[in-house]
Structure formats: C-alpha cells, structure tokens
Amino acid sequence: MASETQGGCGCPPTEAPVPPTGGVHHVFLAVNDLARSRPFYAALMPRLGYPGTSDEGGPVAGWWGACGSFWLKQADPRYAGATFSKDRVGLCEVAFRAESRAQVDALARDVAGFGGKILDPPREYPEYVPGYYAVFFADPDGIKLELVHIPK
C-alpha cells in the first residue's frame, strides 16, 4: 500500500478494485461526542467489513474496507446536543449488508455491550423483499443503523 491518502479524505488508498462509478465511496457522520462514539464504532465497524482504521485520537476517526470507508467527526459546537431524527431532511439511516442471518443475530446480541441500542430486534421484513432479515439499532447519538441479510 502507498502512504498517500485517496481523494483528500484522509482514508488510505485501497488495493481492492474500485468501480469507476456507482457504489458509495464513504459515509461521514458528525457526532455530539467523538470520544463517546469512538468505542462504539471501533467495536462495530470491523464486524461489518471495515477492518482498517485511522484513529489516532485526532479530530476524525475512520474505518475502511473493500466497500469504501466510514468516518466520524466532532459536530460543530453550534449544534452541541442536537439529536438525530430520521424524519428531518438529511440522513434517514445507514444500512450495512450481512453475510448471514447469524451475523445479524450476533450483532443484535452484542450491540448494547458497546454502547448502542436495539430499535427493532432481528426479524424478517417480507414487506421489503422476500428473505429480508434485519436488525435496526442506534449509535450513541441515536443515529439509526441497520444490518441486513438478503439471501441470493
């Protein structure tokens, strides 16, 4: 791997093939308390396929994998204490793909232990697509996250 970063985002270059278009390159969230959110995401992201990390205690923390990267920063002090709402303009939720139902179930068992909260326990959501199996949970700021498995 080269020591340069890609695109000025602070994320390291990837050796994985990157399609020229499509997909999501990165997600960047602002959080109320970066020190509180770091341990949650440090436990979560490797389990979701983002094993690389860029977190030396600075103003941002990031994780990356073959599918892109996920970043956190301290929210601007003008918005201190603001709460997340999936119904406001902006982000509704972030959903990650699971390899299996077992991965969904395991995360659901463990998410509270690293500072998250289960919003909806694992179950099938046939109203979405057949076989859609997911858990919905929140990070320490209440940002809605999802882990979903859909059989091939």
Predicted feature descriptions by range:
Residues 2-38, 94, 151-152:
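N-terminal beta-strand motif that seeds the catalytic metal site of vicinal oxygen chelate
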Residues 11-13, 17-18, 61, 65-106:
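Long, continuous compositionally biased terminal/linker segments
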Residues 28-76:
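Core segments of cupin and vicinal oxygen chelate
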Residues 31-36, 94-140:
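Vicinal oxygen chelate
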Residues 54-55, 120-121, 151:
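A generic structural-conservation signal
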Residues 67, 140-142:
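Glycine-centered tight beta-turn/hairpin loop motif at sheet-sheet or coil-to-beta transitions
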Residues 126-127, 150-152:
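A short acidic/small-residue loop/turn micro-motif
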Residues 144-147:
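Short glycine-/small-residue motifs
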